Swiss-Prot record:
The nucleosome is a histone octamer containing two molecules each of H2A, H2B, H3 and H4 assembled in one H3-H4 heterotetramer and two H2A-H2B heterodimers. The octamer wraps approximately 147 bp of DNA. H2A or its variant H2A.Z forms a heterodimer with H2B. H2A.Z associates with the VPS72/SWC2 subunit of the SWR1 chromatin remodeling complex. Also interacts with RBP1/DNA-directed RNA polymerase II largest subunit. SUPFAM superfamilies: Histone-fold. Variant histone H2A which can replace H2A in some nucleosomes. Nucleosomes wrap and compact DNA into chromatin, limiting DNA accessibility to the cellular machineries which require DNA as a template. Histones thereby play a central role in transcription regulation, DNA repair, DNA replication and chromosomal stability. DNA accessibility is regulated via a complex set of post-translational modifications of histones, also called histone code, and nucleosome remodeling. The modification N6-acetyllysine is found at residues 4, 9. GO terms for molecular function: chromatin DNA binding; identical protein binding; protein heterodimerization activity; RNA polymerase II cis-regulatory region sequence-specific DNA binding; structural constituent of chromatin. GO terms for biological process: CENP-A eviction from euchromatin; heterochromatin formation; nuclear-transcribed mRNA catabolic process, non-stop decay; regulation of transcription by RNA polymerase II; silent mating-type cassette heterochromatin formation; transcription elongation by RNA polymerase II. The gene is HTZ1. One of its GO terms (cellular component) is nucleosome. Residues 1-10 have a biased composition (Gly residues). This is Histone H2A.Z.
Length: 138
């Protein structure tokens, strides 16, 4: 029995050395995010049966990958500053709220993220005179 790859009806059979190597659209675009899956989601989730071009999925995947890398880099820096090895929702919150552009883009509430530390200026004493303990005269 010959080693036949691909199966199918009729036509020439290809041996394993002649088998066509499949390349994904993600690898063609040099991305890690799944271009095919994003294209499928774009097609299935649109309301008015609008046609979705092939490049649209590549653009969306590249934007998502860039934003994810940006947020993870900032969150990793926040975790490193706090000397921990695991990124938590708190680190994500600090990273997103610390970056002006990401803060404008991501207005969502992050569960377990806490709040940013901030004390209003009027509540902070400027140069309050230190009270010296009165000497006990005996």
């Amino acid at each position: 029995m010959s080693s036949k790859v691909g199966g199918g009806k009729g036509g020439k059979s290809k041996t394993s050395s002649e088998a066509k190597v499949l390349t994904t659209r993600s690898s063609k675009a040099g991305l890690q995010f799944p271009v095919g899956r994003i294209h499928r989601f774009l097609r299935n989730k649109n309301a008015n049966n609008v046609r979705i071009g092939a490049k649209a999925a590549v653009y969306v995947a590249s934007i998502m990958e860039y934003l994810t890398a940006e947020v993870l880099e900032l969150a990793g820096n926040a975790a490193k500053d706090l000397r921990v090895k695991r990124i938590t929702p708190r680190h994500l919150q600090l990273a997103i709220r610390g970056d002006e552009e990401l803060d404008l883009l991501i207005r969502a509430t992050i569960a377990g993220g806490g709040v940013l530390p901030h004390i209003h200026k009027s509540l902070v004493a400027k140069n309050a005179p230190l009270k010296k303990p009165k000497a006990l005269d005996a």
